[in-house]
């Protein structure tokens, strides 16, 4: 599979992972964990803009494909999503759960295999997890990772 860009904007892949999701499952149970995942998916779908598309990737991970003019614009989208998640509690039958996500953003270059783009975004996201969570990280074409 490859990501194809047919417009003048660049394509970016944002990989989101719910921080400490295992703790949610261990504390509240898998049913509440499932409610959290479904609710977050609904939130993400409502928060994405016309040039962004959200997908459930698996487990507690989501992918957002972002069309942006440049790296900075794509990074702003990542920060916006992380802040929205941080500012909206998930309501369930027993109350509310405050969650955060860590995001990794990578540009998808023309004809580049999807797994390569996901791998780069995953490395950026992992770096964000290792350096504190609840943040957005960008990985550039030289594989340099920076917090945004």
Give residue ranges: language-model regions.
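Short, conserved catalytic or interaction motifs in soluble domains
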Residues: 26, 67-68, 90, 129-130, ...
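Short catalytic/binding micro-motifs of nucleotide second-messenger systems
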Residues: 46-51, 83-95, 125-127
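Conserved long alpha-helical elements within nucleotide-processing catalytic cores of c-di-GMP signaling
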Residues: 1-12, 19-46, 55-59, 63-64, ...
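PAS and PAS-like sensory/regulatory domains
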Residues: 36, 97-101
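Residue-level recognition of strand-loop junctions within catalytic nucleotide-signaling folds
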Residues: 26, 65-69, 86, 108-109
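Catalytic-core segments of nucleotide cyclases and related cyclic-nucleotide turnover enzymes
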Residues: 75, 93, 107-148
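A short pre-motif secondary-structure segment
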Residues: 53-56, 97
């Amino acid at each position: 599979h490859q990501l194809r860009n047919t417009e003048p904007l660049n394509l970016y892949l944002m990989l989101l992972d719910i921080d400490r999701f295992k703790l949610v499952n261990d504390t509240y149970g898998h049913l509440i964990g499932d409610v959290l995942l479904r609710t977050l998916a609904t939130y993400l779908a409502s928060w994405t803009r016309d040039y962004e598309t959200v997908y459930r990737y698996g487990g507690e991970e989501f992918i957002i494909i972002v069309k942006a003019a440049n790296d900075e614009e794509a990074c702003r989208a990542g920060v916006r999503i992380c802040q929205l998640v941080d500012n909206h509690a998930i309501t369930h039958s027993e109350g509310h759960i405050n969650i955060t996500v860590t995001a990794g953003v990578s540009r998808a270059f023309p004809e580049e295999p999807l797994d390569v783009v996901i791998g780069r975004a995953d490395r950026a996201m992992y770096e964000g997890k290792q350096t504190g969570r609840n943040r957005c990280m960008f990985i550039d074409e030289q594989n340099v990772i920076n917090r945004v």
